[in-house]
Each structure stands twice: as C-alpha cells, then as structure tokens.
Curated annotation (Swiss-Prot):
The keyword Chloroplast does not apply. The lineage of its organism: Bacteria, Bacillati, Bacillota, Bacilli, Bacillales. This is Membrane protein YknW. Induction: Expressed in exponential-phase cells. The chain crosses the membrane at residues 38-58, 93-113, 128-148, 171-191, 205-225. InterPro entries: Yip1_dom.
Length: 231
C-alpha cells in the first residue's frame, strides 16, 4: 500500500489510515485534525453497513417474529407477504438509517466540541465520525454474519450483554446497548474529540459518556414502549 503523504512548506502530513484506527487511534485522530479524510472512509464504512444490514435481515426469520404479534385473521400466504415486506423494509431502513447517521453524528460531535470550548469544522467531525463508525459497522457485520449462519435471536446483538444474559422487554433493550463494538466506538469517540476536536481529555470523556447515557435512556424507553404495545 502506498504511503499517502502531503507535503506542505517542507513538512509532511500523512493521510489518516481508516483501519489504523484499530491499532493506533490517537495517531489517526491527530492526522484527521490536520488532514481530514472523507470519501475513502465513507465508501468503505457504507459498504460494510450495507453488507451487515443485508446479512442481518436475510438471517432473520420474520415469519416467526410475526407469530408473536397480533396477526389473527391473516392467512399463511398473507403472513408470508407481510414477512417479506417487513424483511426488505427493515433492510432498507437499516441501510438508510445507518448511512444517514454518518452525516448526522458529526453535527452532534461539533456541538460537543463547541460547548467544551474547542474549535473545529464539520468536515473534521465528519471524518472523525467515519473513523469511529468503522468499529460499530464492523460490529454490525459480525452480528450480521452470526444471524445469517446461525439460529440465534437476531433482535439482540450476540456481542452485547443481551446476547449473554437471558432477558426481554426494556431490560433486554438496555442490555443490548452494552455491546462490545459500541462501547469500543464510544471510547474512540472520547479520544477523537480530544485529539481531533482539540478539547481536554476530561471534556472528551464527559461528552462520550453523556452521549452513551442518552443512548441507554432512549433504549430503555423504546423497550418500555414496545413492551406495552406488545402486551
């Protein structure tokens, strides 16, 4: 692989390596601050999201899931039609939502940096978002492969506490947020906000913890609503 180097006034700034975020995140985030990379990482992360979402949807037996819903009065053929629509609708939703999040998250990160007294740009935060999202998208891919090749419950990540601790309803939704790749990405986010956003380590960690806390609360209420709706 050729070395990406940009020369400027006698100095050389290396282009950040997307997969380098796995082994040397601090170095990549410092490079992003000087030379944010977008298009290459965007194509790679988007491709991983698409493959992961497709595998997870194809590995989900929606006919079985629909049996637990209020589907009385539907014939077997109608059930199959609903299951097919749900499968491909869920697949499209996961792909569109996953890619849209890549562009929405940088706005939140930008706000975190501004509130913490740092100075940054949307492009730098977009690059940071793509590098951090590599980890969560790899998690989606891993869980997609597991769902496609095994009979595990695809509603909850096998790499989360929900995949280890038997639970359902709101508790399962909360446990599902404590997922290896998700937590890893939030740790990288804390480092990235410090290195790329230029804010203090403390501010970076506080921002990441608050965002993770919001995710947990959202999952709790989502689980409660689904439990009530399914009651």
């Amino acid at each position: 692989m050729e070395t990406n180097v940009e020369k400027n006034s006698g100095t050389a700034t290396e282009k950040p390596s997307l997969f380098g975020v796995i082994t040397s995140p601090s170095v990549q985030f410092e490079r992003i601050r000087e030379r944010p990379a977008v298009w290459g990482p965007l194509l790679i992360v988007a491709a991983i999201i698409i493959v992961g979402a497709v595998l997870q949807s194809l590995g989900t037996d929606y006919s079985e899931l629909l049996k637990s819903q209020d589907t009385q009065g539907l014939s077997a053929e109608q059930m199959e039609t609903v299951a097919t629509i749900t499968k491909f609708g869920g697949m499209a939703g996961a792909i569109i939502g996953g890619i849209a999040a890549l562009f929405i998250a940088p706005l939140i990160y930008w706000l975190c940096v501004k509130v913490s007294g740092g100075v940054t740009t949307y492009k730098k935060m977009l690059s940071l978002s793509l590098f951090v999202s590599l980890i969560s998208s790899l998690g989606l891919l891993v869980n997609g492969i597991v769902a496609f090749t095994t009979d595990v419950n695809p509603l909850y990540s096998t790499t989360s506490l929900a995949g280890i601790i038997p639970s359902d309803g709101a508790l399962a939704s909360v446990l599902n947020t404590f997922e290896i790749f998700s937590i890893w990405s939030f740790v990288l986010l804390a480092i990235g906000l410090h290195k790329t956003g230029g804010i203090s380590k403390k501010a970076g960690w506080i921002s990441a913890i608050i965002l993770f806390g919001i995710l947990v609360v959202f999952s709790l209420f989502s689980g409660l609503i689904n439990s009530v709706a399914g009651a």
